[in-house]
Structure formats: C-alpha cells, structure tokens
Curated annotation (Swiss-Prot):
Keywords: Ribonucleoprotein, Ribosomal protein, RNA-binding, rRNA-binding
Record InterPro entries: Ribosomal_uL14, Ribosomal_uL14_bac-type, Ribosomal_uL14_CS, Ribosomal_uL14_sf
Pfam family, one: Ribosomal_L14
GO MF, one example: structural constituent of ribosome
Species annotation: Gloeothece citriformis (strain PCC 7424)
Gene: rplN
Subunit record text: Part of the 50S ribosomal subunit. Forms a cluster with proteins L3 and L19. In the 70S ribosome, L14 and L19 interact and together make contacts with the 16S rRNA in bridges B5 and B8.
Protein name: Large ribosomal subunit protein uL14
Superkingdom of origin: Bacteria
Gene Ontology biological-process annotations: translation
Family affiliation: Belongs to the universal ribosomal protein uL14 family.
Length: 122
C-alpha cells in the first residue's frame, strides 16, 4: 500500500533511482495505491546525465509492493521492496528496460509494454 510521502525504488533505466509519492491517481478520494495504480511522484535520487533529473515531477505506475496482494485463487504475493516504473502521459514507460519481477495484475490494467519488458512476471 503506497500513500503520500512513501519512497519507492525505480525499476527501469530512465535515470531515476528513488521516487517519493506525492499523489495516488484514480478514484476520487483514493488514499492508498497498490500494484497497477498510477501515482504522481518526485525524483529524490537520480543518475547524472540522464533524461530524468532530481526534483522532476513524474508520473509512475506501481509494479511491486511489500504489502501482500491476495489473488482470487487464494494465493498471496509479497515483494521485497516498493517499486515503480516511470511512464509518460500515454502510459508507455520512459525507460527501455525493466528490472526485477512484476505482478501479473499489470497485464489486466493494460500495461502490456511494461509486462513485455520485465524479465519475470509473477
């Protein structure tokens, strides 16, 4: 569960390393975000000479959370970290690679480009 002020790792090669969530997008008064939800975030740590700079406000989609995710089959998935992928306004990732596993729920929310770039889908 991601809320305001939550720090997330960046799971792509866009140039950012750490994000801080400013707002969870979606339904009206949405306080918490889960896997597949879009957020507005600020870049807190970045790699020099890359397209995304420190203090840039970006849009991202959550791909991993430490909070357990319960599926309809009864299976529970929990990742080791909170991570997001930076996207543009069209919903496509800014980076060309995605690091680490991502959840299958991203495919249901039409983030097929992120799923296809990921090395492992759980």
């Amino acid at each position: 569960m991601i809320q305001q002020q939550t720090y997330l790792n960046v799971a792509d090669n866009s140039g950012a390393r750490k994000l801080m969530c400013l707002r969870v997008l979606g339904t009206g008064n949405c306080r918490y975000g889960g896997i597949g939800d879009e957020i507005i975030a600020v870049v807190k740590d970045a790699i020099p000479n890359m397209p995304v700079k420190k203090s840039d406000v970006v849009k991202a989609v959550i791909v991993r959370t430490r909070h357990p995710l319960r599926r309809a089959s009864g299976m529970t998935i929990r990742f080791d970290d909170n991570a997001a992928v930076i996207i543009n306004n069209d919903g496509n990732p800014k980076g060309t690679r995605v690091f680490g596993p991502v959840a299958r729920e991203l495919r249901d929310k039409n983030y097929t480009k992120i799923v296809s770039l990921a090395p492992e889908v759980l």
